[in-house]
Amino acid sequence: MKICIDARWIFPEISGIGTYTREILSQLTKLDSRNEYLVLFDNVSVRKRIWHETGAESSENFSAVTLDYGVFSVSGQFKLPFLLKKQSVDIYHSPNYMIPFLAFPRNRPGRTRCIVT
C-alpha cells in the first residue's frame, strides 16, 4: 500500500502539528517496512533536517517530494490531486483538517482515501 503523509505542516519553527507529524514519521520508520511512504514537504531545509532526524534517510520504503506550493496555496488545491493520482497513492494522511478539496471525490473508482488527524 502506498501512503502519502503531508509533512508540509512541519515548519522551521517548532509547532504542535509539526512535532506530531515528525513523531509519526519517526515511529513509522521503525515500525513499518511493508508499506511504501511518500512524504510531502514544501521546504528543502526542513526536508533535509526531518529526513535525518526521523531515520527516513535509511529507510528504503520512504521517499520524499518537495513541492513548490505550501499548505495554504490555492494552486496546491489543484496540483496536489494530480500528484496523488500520478504517484498511485492509496491513502493520503493530513495532520491538519485542511485538505485539497478536489482530491477525494466519492464517486471515483479506485480513488485515494483520506485520513485527517
Tell me what each language-model feature is.
Residues 1-117:
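Carbohydrate transferase catalytic cores enriched for Leloir-type hexosyltransferases
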